[in-house]
């Protein structure tokens, strides 16, 4: 008998930030993560690893692009080919990097403009309104 690893995502979106969640199913586990508890998602090949505010991690076999399409735009933003961040936790933005807690994340050129819009960066807003 063949044993195949499968993963399933179940979403429940609330009307406001903090009320939605994602349920991640692995081969032998299921874990519900509230959107408000997810700091970032890190992609590595065919896998995505969720990093929670309590320091826990959950890895599932979905590419980061699938996760980008699955997570709500009003909470999460892709900043690099390997990272999706909960933008509510971004502390610092310097040059081509952003910081959440003690960790710095690179910001790719393809994602910079959207990040500046989401963060309401004043200089970027003035340039885009011309």
Locate each region found by the language model:
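Short, charged, intrinsically disordered terminal tails
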Residues: 120-130
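A cross-family signal for key residues in well-ordered alpha-helices
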Residues: 68, 116-117
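Conserved binding/recognition cores within well-folded domains
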Residues: 2-100, 104
């Amino acid at each position: 008998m063949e044993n195949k690893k499968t993963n399933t995502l179940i979403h429940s979106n609330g009307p406001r930030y903090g009320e939605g969640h994602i349920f991640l199913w692995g081969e032998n586990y299921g874990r519900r993560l509230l959107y408000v508890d997810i700091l970032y998602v890190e992609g590595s090949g065919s896998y995505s690893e969720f990093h929670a505010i309590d320091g826990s991690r959950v890895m599932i076999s979905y590419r980061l692009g699938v996760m980008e399409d699955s997570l709500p735009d009003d909470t999460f933003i892709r900043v690099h080919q390997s990272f999706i961040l909960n933008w509510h936790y971004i502390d610092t933005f310097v040059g081509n990097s952003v910081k959440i807690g003690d960790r710095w994340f690179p910001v790719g050129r393809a994602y910079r403009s959207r990040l500046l819009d989401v963060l309401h960066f004043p200089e970027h807003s003035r340039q885009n309104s011309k």
